[in-house]
């Protein structure tokens, strides 16, 4: 007969005692695998992702200086408490053995260097001579580094901290950086004078307006007004809609041909970034394009994370879609990693929004967003506000080079209303159809253009 088990038994930790009781009741031997058998089975599986996860977990744990007891307290609060505690039963001994091995070899890893330096400063084993501490890219700071800076400030009351950062570009939570350290700077470091750098020498005013409005939809982001040296605003963000995945290559190539013509007329080589949320967005024909356009265009593919701090004349952001491998990403992190990461932000997709902002602002002249007709990203409707008309241009592959009339769907909020041709003529329909059936008549000016 079958033995019934439930997920509740697993979560409560009673699963194995229940199995033992039921097997004994059926006069069957209860034979748990020995540790050696379990290790042999794990060796057969050869799971680099599990090894990498444990390594990342230990690194983040050390960065935040968390003890096993603190981790268990957090695990007790997780939805799958049994899984979290079982994971700690594995990872804590590994962590301890790792530290013992480092000590035996008289070695330290990077996180230990930071932690040891912090301890030496606090215990005054090292008395620093510094009057000013300069920290760049402060939005990426993690708790371990912040603790070292704070220890140095506390050791010498005359020491001053000068930090430069942009909370709009904080995109490394997965590596332990905590945006709250910057957004709540006075809370962590005391009385603070803040100076805003309000001029940008990279993107034009059109890109700047769109990107700044988008990022500040999250009220937790610091409010800033940014002025661009280049005042251009017309058609600086272009949304390129395509029908099928195989259309992307021809769509991109067509745009590159146009940009190559511009480069020839300007008698210079233009720098072009192709950016992807994921590395698999890299076009298979990139090498061919580099060869074809080598005299006009300097082409480069980068992930959005790697593009931070860089700039190009024109930028194409690929795969601005919903669904699998989407942007914003809908891949859910393993809840176990939350045991050692900063507290998640309340605003939906907060870090993905900052990553999108980074992509938008890599361009000096124009940013192109490629989106699939049937999988339009939830970020796209936010760029189609009336005040941005003329700056943001929506181009449908079906309508050629002409700007398509589009607007955010008022019903679902994540789709867009655009021209659809039905049996009784054209009308405005939602891109989320059939999940959203909102429709309306064409605006008079668009109706007049229909044949």
PLM ranges: what are they?
Residues 1-107:
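A basic/glycine-biased coupling hinge at the interface between accessory DNA-binding modules
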Residues 191-193, 200-296:
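Helicase P-loop NTPase motor core
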Residues 420-428:
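Short linker/helix segments within small regulatory modules
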């Amino acid at each position: 007969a079958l033995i019934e088990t439930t997920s509740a038994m697993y979560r409560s930790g009673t699963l194995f005692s229940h199995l033992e009781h039921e097997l004994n009741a059926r006069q069957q031997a209860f034979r748990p695998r020995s540790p050696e058998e379990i290790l042999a089975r794990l060796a057969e599986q050869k799971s680099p992702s599990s090894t990498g996860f444990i390594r990342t977990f230990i690194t983040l744990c050390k960065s935040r200086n968390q003890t096993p007891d603190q981790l268990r307290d957090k695990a007790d609060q997780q939805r799958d408490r049994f899984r979290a505690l079982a994971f700690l039963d594995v990872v804590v001994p590994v962590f301890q053995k790792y530290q013992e091995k480092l000590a035996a070899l008289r070695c330290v890893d990077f996180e230990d260097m930071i932690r040891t330096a912090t301890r030496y400063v606090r215990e005054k084993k090292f008395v620093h001579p510094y009057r000013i501490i300069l920290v760049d890219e402060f939005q990426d700071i993690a708790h371990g580094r912040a603790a070292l800076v704070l220890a140095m400030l506390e050791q010498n009351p005359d020491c001053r901290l000068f930090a430069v950062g942009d909370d709009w570009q904080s995109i490394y939570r997965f590596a332990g950086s905590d945006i709250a350290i910057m957004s709540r700077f006075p809370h962590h470091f005391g009385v603070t004078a803040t100076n805003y750098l309000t001029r940008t020498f990279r993107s034009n005013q059109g890109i700047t307006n769109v990107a700044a409005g988008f990022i500040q939809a999250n009220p937790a982001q610091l409010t800033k007004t940014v002025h661009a040296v280049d005042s251009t605003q017309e058609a600086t963000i272009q949304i390129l809609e395509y029908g099928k995945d195989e259309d992307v290559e021809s769509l991109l190539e067509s745009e590159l041909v146009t940009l190559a013509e511009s480069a020839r007329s300007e008698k210079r080589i233009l720098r072009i970034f192709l950016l992807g949320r994921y590395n698999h967005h890299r076009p298979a024909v990139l090498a061919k394009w580099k060869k074809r356009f080598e005299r006009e265009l300097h082409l480069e593919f980068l992930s959005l994370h790697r593009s931070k701090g860089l700039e190009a004349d024109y930028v194409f952001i690929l795969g601005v879609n919903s669904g699998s491998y989407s942007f914003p990403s809908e891949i859910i992190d393993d809840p176990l990693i939350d045991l050692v990461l900063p507290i998640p932000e309340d605003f939906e997709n907060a870090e993905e929004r900052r990553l999108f902002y980074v992509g938008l602002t890599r361009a000096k002249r124009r940013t192109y967003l490629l989106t699939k007709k049937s999988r339009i990203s939830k970020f796209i409707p936010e760029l189609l506000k009336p005040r941005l008309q003329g700056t943001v241009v929506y181009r449908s592959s079906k309508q050629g080079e002409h700007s398509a009339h589009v607007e955010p769907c008022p019903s679902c909020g994540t789709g867009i209303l655009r021209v659809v041709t039905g049996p009784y003529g054209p009308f405005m329909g939602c891109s989320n159809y059939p999940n959203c059936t909102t429709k309306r008549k064409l605006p008079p000016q668009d109706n007049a253009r229909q044949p």
